[in-house]
Amino acid sequence: DDRIIDGTTLRLNPDEVKLLYNNASYLIAMGVTDFSEISRDDVLDAYEDMEEEAGLLIPHPQNEPVIGVIDTQFNEKVYFHEWVEYKNLLDPNIPLSRKDYEHGTAVSYIIVDGPQGNPELADGCGRFRVRHFGVATNNGFSSFTVLKMIRNIVASNRDIKVWNLSLGSKLEIKPNFISPEAAELDRIQSEYDVIFVVAGTNIPAGVTKKNMRIGSPADSLNSMVVNAVDFAGNSASYTRIGPVLSFFHKPDVSYYGGDGTVYTDKMVVCKDDMGAAYVAGTSFAAP
């Protein structure tokens, strides 16, 4: 058995460790110290520590890189909350509903622990910590207000070099000029030496137009703009197209965003403290 290192050392998963504690705890005690030196309290404390560690769905964060997320709000009751530093930048007088937390929480989940529910996302890069700024509600937002917030956020968090922005307009960009939102995003990236990863925007529900152009700020030239594909690599049914100014190819890349009518075709996310949810969209391809 490749899990046995020598006559007294072997590798076990948490469930096997718990089973060993229950059925043959003296074997572990002999391997640690003289059994006569262990009190009943020592055994109970060690068992409680082991149970707590086995029950963790995710390890504690350490010195992992930090990604900035600018989105709707973040639900601090989710299992990975330790990995996310959250700041609500909306006026405290603005009432928030449960829906206002779902989109932003799902986006940060993908960055922190996406491969947990989506094995296709496992790229060997590990987990990332997130600094999450809530700038919008689920009901919509003023793009100019958000852009002003983004400039202040980036200026105040110079240690973060990569930012995720999964917010965008339902309207199409104009064929002959870059949107004011994208132009400002380009300026911010140039001034502060950062890069934004921007969702390529979705075709809104109920719209039947084919070849719908992307919405701002997905026409940002300096940003990495991400469209979505299904798990077979086909372009998702809700994706929109470029180019920008007739010759800048946008979106730049595509990644898994989920698509289809059954839950197995969608992305698994944690958007609240109620368990897994199934979603699709460029918002979840970008992170």
What are these regions (language model features)?
Residues 56-87, 94-143, 193, 220-222, ...:
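Subtilisin-like serine protease catalytic core
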Residues 1-58:
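Autoinhibitory propeptides
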Residues 36-69, 234-248:
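Long, acidic, intrinsically disordered low-complexity segments
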Residues 71-73, 79, 213-287:
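Extracellular S/T/G-rich loop segment that most often corresponds to the catalytic His/Ser-adjacent loop
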Residues 93-105, 276-287:
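Gly/Ser-rich catalytic serine loop of serine hydrolases
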Residues 136-216, 276-280, 284:
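Substrate-binding/access-modulating region of protease and related hydrolase catalytic domains
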Residues 22-26, 187-190, 215-220, 245:
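Short, surface-exposed basic-aromatic patches at helix termini and helix-loop junctions that form
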Residues 73-75, 138, 169-171, 202-205, ...:
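Solvent-exposed loop/turn segments at secondary-structure junctions
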